């Protein structure tokens, strides 16, 4: 009898082991992300005319601020002409340069969150709605920290031993894997944004010396913004929600001259008295960087994405609008 019981026990253990192993195989073989059925990356055609325009626009900024020692290495820019959605043209200046993006990374987290919600990976709550709004509209770092926790199933805390840290790091890198699955390269979007500094496991994950900080290129940023505008990243309803969060009232009054509507690309529209234009954007600003990712529509039919990243001139408000003004003045001349 004892032999029969022992044999049955072994059989049960074997079956459980086989079922577990088989289940793990099925899970690992399944795709991690569900992209929209009709999703395909925006097709971009390099345009010599746009390249000449963008080179001149960046050159105008370099000339204007040469007395302050603004150099080519301090500016990166990408321009996408969206007037013909079926035939997108683009150009870039240092567009593949990896640069710390500051709060521009929050746009990437917004898109990921909307994908998670659409796929049922997370369930929308009032607190999540509040966090998303504050992350994009007010550029709140605390809200971003919460949203990244939701996206990755990780949380801040004390440093971890190696094995536990590896598990935590794999989960935290899920947003990177999401964008890699769509063909994005040369970017890193796995870090929380802080008003001061990171501590504990966040500093451990950053690499202590900062070698795992968030990094974006203007090319990748412009591509994502164009895909949002064109409705490629999600449903029409979720696209509208994201666009509403990024809508900027540059013509309205503000108590903060450096807010996202009045302190970046919006300055160009204000200077040119283009109150009938429309602006959607996500800006980023630190002690060393000043960036903006903007989509503009004008009354005369111009539609374009312009992403400008600047380094080492964080408090110079007019570099980005100088580039934008030149684009506004000349894009309409290109057919």
Feature map (PLM): residue ranges:
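Structured C-terminal helix/loop/strand segments within mature extracytoplasmic catalytic/sensor domains
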Residues: 23-61, 69-71, 167, 213, ...
């Amino acid at each position: 009898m004892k032999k029969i019981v022992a044999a049955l026990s072994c059989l049960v253990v074997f079956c459980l082991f086989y079922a577990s192993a088989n289940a793990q195989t099925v899970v690992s073989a399944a795709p991690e992300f569900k992209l929209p059925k009709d999703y395909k990356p925006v097709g971009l055609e390099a345009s010599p005319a746009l390249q000449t325009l963008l080179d001149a626009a960046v050159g105008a900024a370099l000339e204007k601020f040469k007395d302050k020692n603004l150099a080519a290495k301090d500016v990166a820019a990408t321009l996408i002409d969206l007037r013909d959605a079926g035939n997108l043209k683009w150009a870039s200046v240092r567009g593949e340069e990896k640069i710390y993006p500051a709060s521009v990374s929050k746009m990437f987290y917004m898109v990921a969150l909307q994908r998670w919600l659409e796929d049922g990976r997370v369930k929308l709550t009032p607190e999540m709605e509040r966090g998303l709004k504050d992350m994009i509209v007010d550029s709140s770092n605390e809200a971003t920290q919460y949203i990244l926790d939701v996206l990755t199933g990780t949380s801040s805390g004390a440093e971890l031993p190696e094995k536990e840290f590896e598990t935590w790091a794999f989960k935290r890198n899920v947003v990177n894997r999401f964008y890699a699955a769509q063909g994005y390269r040369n970017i890193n979007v796995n870090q929380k944004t802080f008003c001061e500094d990171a501590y504990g496991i966040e500093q451990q994950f950053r690499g202590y010396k900062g070698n795992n900080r968030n990094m974006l290129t203007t090319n990748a940023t412009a591509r994502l913004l164009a895909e949002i505008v064109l409705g490629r990243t999600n449903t029409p309803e979720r696209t509208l929600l994201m666009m509403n969060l990024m809508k900027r009232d540059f013509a309205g009054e503000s108590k903060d001259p450096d807010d996202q509507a009045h302190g970046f690309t919006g300055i160009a529209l204000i200077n040119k008295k283009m109150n009938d234009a429309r602006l959607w954007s996500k800006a980023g600003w630190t002690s060393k960087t000043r960036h903006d990712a903007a989509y503009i529509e004008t009354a005369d039919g111009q539609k374009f994405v312009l992403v400008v990243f600047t380094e080492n001139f964080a408090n110079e408000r007019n570099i980005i609008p100088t580039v934008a003004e030149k684009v506004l003045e000349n894009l309409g001349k290109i057919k």
